[in-house]
Structures are given as structure tokens and as C-alpha cells.
């Protein structure tokens, strides 16, 4: 999955470890055209799409992260106005550089008709990748433009009320006449689709934003329900999204906001994702009267990640393990509630080592500036070395164990791993186990934990397993490691 903010060079892509049959890029603030497949060409814009775009155009903004003291931008994304007081919704990953390094970056918005002014950050929802901003220059002008500019523009019929957005806000279509580039209008806030009107499978929706910094656009697609196995709800949007559209609105036929652009798959066509509008509504309610965030927002990020890791640990442990599939051992494999598992096998044709591999990962990862966290993955490999003999098998088996690395992030983000190795007994099954932990330097209460396990009872066969949890507390790291180790047993 690739987040859709675009960097100035469009040249950075971060790819996570992937199942062989279902690879995906992780959330990242930028996209490399050379490294990822281009989005599928959008279908011709319908008359309905034109109507929706013309109604929404005065509410759209491009959000630029710029270096302090200079005009150079480091990333761009999209956003949209949600109140006449100048509140703007976008993605956290769009503004993360300014949120985490405010001493180096500023935020500005650019409207569809070219106006540019500064922004301030009021509230963050890191877990759902949302941010609430406010136009730092324009509280009075925004209210005035929403109340008066629309009525004075050519073709305008009514003004938009300057009220806070709620789930039951009146629809946009009746209150916003079509705008045109020849007669630009003032900002007009978008309304959210009422919660009493849930989307139906196959319903047409429209995504708006500024892809690749080339200009505002609209893409048409369909609502395909919520994404399966996502830890937090996300909408599966059957339409094309491109880098730079992150944070833009997704609208229904009436111009109501139903979601916020957030990511797309790079290994498929028109497989895109939206944050459901309900989370933006909640963010607005919590943050519309908040003072601007001053200084790096790591404290806010840390607090929200603490909530996430607690919920993740509880849910992961509560779900238990699948029934054993290995003929000799009970090997920990999670159910596919919020993880997906893939398997491969390789039979040596030269009398070497045969093995089977299973790998399970969460699709959900929490974006934190230059890296992601808040996820769990695990795998196991079953080895058959009967063609090698005990000595050669022992050498290959031990080498595979030693090949594992426990360094994930650069030194500026995380400490070196500290590991303990021991030989343990699980219900009579001898195991070699290594537990490693790494601390986050700017998120001081969070750790990554890795557990590496190898069975030792057979001279020509065995199972090796690895468990990784990112962004958990020290106590939960210990709890998860023990939960994983306890799952290795004999099959009886």
C-alpha cells in the first residue's frame, strides 16, 4: 500500500517485506514512478463527475510542506475545507514533516484558483492517518467568503452556512452552485454524508485531489465495502488514485464527503483506499477549537501509539492460534482476523535441503514520519535435511538461524538491538530461543521485539520461527514474546 503525498523529486519509495503472491508498498510520503506501476487510466469523466467537481472545486486545496526560509517544497498533498472558519482536513502523512520537524518546515495551502497562505496544525489522528489544519491567515476572510463571495459570483444561488460540520449536516448539492475558473468563488466548506445514509456496495463515488502537483482533478470509481482484515476500518475504493491526492475528499453524487484519500496498491489496478468520513468528523469535533500545536508532535504520536499497541496486544493474544498443520509440532500460526498468511515450498532437485515457509503479516501499519510501526508479523520454516545427513543439515540449519537480522531502523530513530539467547523446554520440546528488543529514541515508551526460535529434537529436520512486534510497550513486548514461545508444542 502506498500513501499518496508526493515529494518534490517523486523519488522516494519505501517497500515493506511482502508475501510473494501479494506484494505492496508501505505507507510513505512519496512515490517513485520508476519503482511502481502507474495507476490505471481513469474512465472518461461523466456529467455527474463534472457536476461534483464544479461544486467541490472551491473547497479544494493543495497542501505544501516547504523549507523554512525558502520557497522550496519538500512534499505536496491535498486537503479540503470543512468549516467556514478555515478548518481543513488532510492526511497525517501529508503534514508529518511539519508536525515532527516544525523547526525545519512550514505548511502552506494553495487554492484551485492559485491563492496561497500559511496553515497551522490543530489536531492529529495518527492511527487513522488524519490531520486537522486551519488556515492561519484567514479566519475572517474565510467566513466572509463563504457567506458572501458565493452569492455574488456569477451563477450563485445560495450561500453556505458558516457552521461546524456534523454527521447530519445538510447536503452540499442544494447549497453550492457550479463554480468555474472564469468566475472563481471563495472557499466553501464541504459537508459530510449523514451517518443515517450508509453507502451501498457498488455505489458511485468520486475522488478529488492534485495528483503529482499537476493540477486538481477528479476520478470516478465505486464503493466496494470495507477492507477485509484491516485493523482499522478503511474503504475499498475501486478507482485510480495517484501520488499527491492524499488528503483529498471522496464524495458521493450529492457532493457529500464519504472518505479521505489515503493509499493505493501498487501491484494492482484501481485498488485504492479511503479513510471513512466518520473519523474526520470525530477529529473535527475534538480539534476545531484547539490551539495550534507548537513544537514537534512526538508526544501526541507517542500517546496515540500507546493506545494502539495496547489494543493490538489484547486482540492478538485473545484470538489464539490456528490448529497445528505440521505433522510433528504445534507451530504458532494466527487466524486471519486482521492478518493474512502466505505459504511457499521448495523441494531440492540436487539432493539438498527441502523446506516449507509460512509468513503472516498485518496490512495495517502506522505511519510515523520516516518509518512505520504498530504492526505484527510472524513466519516459520520447516526444514527436511534427510538428503543431506546430520552433519551437513546441522551446518545449514545453524546458518539459517544466524542469518537473521534484528536491525530495522537507522540509528537516529532506534537503539541497537539488545538480545538474550537461551535453550528452553516447552512441554518436553527443546528449543533454542533468542529475544531481541530495540527502543525508539523519540518515542521513549515504545519498543520493537523480535523472537527467533529453532527446534532441536531431530538430527535431520526442524522448524525455525520468527515473531516481530513493532511499537509496543516493554511489558507488552514481554507478554507477546511469551505468548509466541508458549505456542510451540508437540503434536499429540
Language model regions located:
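Surface-exposed amphipathic alpha-helical segments
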Residues: 281, 291, 337-339, 459-492
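Signature of long, low-cysteine stretches enriched in small and polar/charged residues
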Residues: 395-456
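Secretory pathway targeting signatures of secreted, lumenal, and periplasmic proteins
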Residues: 339-394
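Active-site region of chymotrypsin-like
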Residues: 56-72, 136-148, 181-191, 214-285, ...
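Bacterial N-terminal signal peptides
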Residues: 1-8
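Active-site substrate-binding loop(s) of clan PA
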Residues: 52, 98-99, 120-122, 138-152, ...
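N-terminal activation segment of mature serine protease catalytic domains
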Residues: 14-78, 290-344
Amino acid at each position: 500500500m502506498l500513501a499518496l503525498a508526493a515529494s518534490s523529486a517523486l523519488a522516494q519509495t519505501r517497500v515493506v517485506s511482502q508475501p510473494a503472491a501479494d506484494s505492496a508498498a508501505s505507507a510513505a510520503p512519496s512515490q517513485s514512478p520508476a519503482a511502481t506501476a502507474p495507476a490505471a487510466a481513469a474512465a472518461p469523466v461523466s456529467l455527474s463527475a463534472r457536476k461534483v467537481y464544479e461544486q467541490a472545486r472551491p473547497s479544494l486545496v493543495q497542501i505544501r510542506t516547504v523549507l523554512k526560509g525558502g520557497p522550496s517544497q519538500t512534499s505536496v498533498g491535498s486537503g479540503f475545507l470543512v468549516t467556514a472558519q478555515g478548518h481543513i482536513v488532510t492526511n497525517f502523512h501529508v503534514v508529518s514533516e511539519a508536525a515532527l520537524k516544525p523547526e525545519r518546515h512550514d505548511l502552506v495551502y494553495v487554492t484551485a484558483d492559485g491563492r496561497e497562505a500559511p496553515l497551522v496544525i490543530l489536531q492529529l489522528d495518527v492511527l487513522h492517518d488524519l490531520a486537522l489544519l486551519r488556515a492561519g491567515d484567514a479566519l475572517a476572510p474565510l467566513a466572509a467568503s463563504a457567506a458572501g463571495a458565493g452569492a455574488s459570483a456569477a451563477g450563485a444561488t445560495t450561500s453556505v452556512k458558516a457552521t461546524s460540520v456534523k454527521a447530519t449536516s445538510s447536503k452540499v448539492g442544494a447549497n453550492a452552485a457550479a463554480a468555474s475558473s472564469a468566475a472563481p468563488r471563495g472557499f466553501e466548506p464541504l459537508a459530510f454524508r449523514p451517518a443515517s445514509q450508509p453507502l451501498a456496495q457498488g455505489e458511485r463515488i468520486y475522488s478529488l485531489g492534485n495528483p503529482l502537483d499537476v493540477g486538481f482533478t477528479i476520478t470516478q470509481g465505486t464503493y466496494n465495502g470495507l477492507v477485509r482484515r484491516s485493523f482499522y476500518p478503511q474503504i475499498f475504493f475501486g478507482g485510480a488514485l495517484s501520488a499527491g491526492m492524499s488528503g483529498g475528499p471522496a464524495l458521493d453524487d450529492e457532493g457529500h464527503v464519504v472518505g479521505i484519500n489515503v493509499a493505493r496498491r501498487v501491484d494492482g489496478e484501481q485498488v485504492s483506499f479511503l479513510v471513512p468520513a466518520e473519523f474526520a468528523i470525530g477529529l473535527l469535533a475534538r480539534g476545531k477549537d484547539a490551539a495550534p500545536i507548537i513544537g514537534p508532535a512526538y508526544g501526541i504520536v507517542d500517546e496515540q501509539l500507546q493506545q494502539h499497541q495496547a489494543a493490538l496486544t489484547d486482540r492478538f493474544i485473545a484470538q489464539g492460534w490456528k490448529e497445528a498443520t505440521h505433522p510433528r509440532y504445534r507451530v504458532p500460526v494466527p487466524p486471519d482476523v486482521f492478518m493474512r498468511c502466505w505459504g511457499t515450498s521448495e523441494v531440492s532437485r540436487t539432493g539438498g535441503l527441502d523446506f516449507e515457509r509460512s509468513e503472516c503479516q498485518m496490512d495495517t501499519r502506522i505511519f510515523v514520519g520516516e518509518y512505520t510501526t504498530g504492526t505484527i508479523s510472524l513466519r516459520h520454516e520447516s526444514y527436511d535435511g534427510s538428503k543431506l545427513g546430520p552433519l551437513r543439515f546441522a551446518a545449514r540449519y545453524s546458518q539459517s538461524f544466524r542469518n537473521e537480522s534484528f536491525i530495522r531502523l537507522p540509528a537516529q530513530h532506534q537503539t541497537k538491538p539488545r538480545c538474550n539467547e537461551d535453550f528452553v523446554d516447552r512441554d518436553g520440546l527443546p528449543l533454542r530461543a533468542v529475544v531481541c528488543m530495540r527502543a525508539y529514541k523519540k518515542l521513549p515508551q515504545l519498543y520493537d521485539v523480535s523472537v527467533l526460535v529453532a527446534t532441536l529434537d531431530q538430527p535431520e529436520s526442524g522448524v525455525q520461527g520468527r515473531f516481530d512486534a513493532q511499537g509496543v510497550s516493554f511489558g507488552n513486548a514481554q507478554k507477546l514474546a511469551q505468548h509466541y514461545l508458549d505456542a510451540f508444542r508437540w503434536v499429540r
